[in-house]
Amino acid sequence: MDYFNKIIIDIELHHVEGIRECFENGINPNDLFHGSPLIDEMITMYTRTPRFKECIKVFVDYGLKFEDPVLLAVLMDDSEMLDKLILQQPEIVIKRYSLKCTYTPLEDVTLLHICAEYNHDACARVL
């Protein structure tokens, strides 16, 4: 089976177990897809479901290297992690991000905008 093509479909469908299966069969969460990190495909895909944060957690469980722990906390809707990070660096609540999402490009937005885009209300409450 071609697990690399499979994971792209599973990412599009937010198929948590399918993504896990791909990682179990040799796909690395830090691989590139069309020159960008595979996680970017997950973040920028047009699908929006409650399973999104579970998919992100599977990437993390299998060794995702993600440079921005604050953004990662929001993408996972991990309000406890976000709260700890804000206590360490309160200025992060006004940091700006740009994500090239398929339907709604998020250009120069705050973490709260990202919470709204992905319907991550636990982190939105912290912010």
Residue ranges and their predicted role:
Residues F4, I8, H15-G18, C22-N30:
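N-terminal alpha-helical scaffold/docking segments in eukaryotic complex subunits
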